């Protein structure tokens, strides 16, 4: 019984810590982890079919992809 109560308390603490990070800050951290470069609007190969700024990616050739608005 003590183990269940302890697990519930730990879960509540972890959830409250996750909620403490604002959504916008979390998105910025995520984009930074992907190595996004929104200034030149190139698609990051590891980011999948999306660009960092939310634009769609058009593949011009194997080595060059650009983001379209």
From Swiss-Prot:
One of its GO terms (molecular function) is toxin activity. Residues 21-34 form a propeptide. Expressed by the venom gland. It comes from the Eukaryota. Keywords: Amidation, Disulfide bond, Knottin, Neurotoxin, Secreted, Signal, Toxin. Residues 1-20 form the signal peptide. The modification Leucine amide is found at residue 68. Belongs to the neurotoxin 01 (U2-agtx) family. The presence of a 'disulfide through disulfide knot' structurally defines this protein as a knottin. This is U2-agatoxin-Ao1y. The lineage of its organism: Eukaryota, Metazoa, Ecdysozoa, Arthropoda, Chelicerata.
């Amino acid at each position: 019984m003590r183990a269940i109560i302890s697990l519930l308390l730990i879960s509540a603490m972890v959830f409250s810590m996750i909620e403490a990070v604002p959504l916008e800050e979390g998105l910025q951290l995520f984009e930074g982890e992907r190595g996004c470069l929104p200034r030149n609007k190139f698609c990051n190969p590891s980011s999948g079919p999306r660009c960092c700024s939310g634009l769609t990616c058009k593949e011009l050739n194997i080595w060059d992809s650009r983001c379209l608005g």
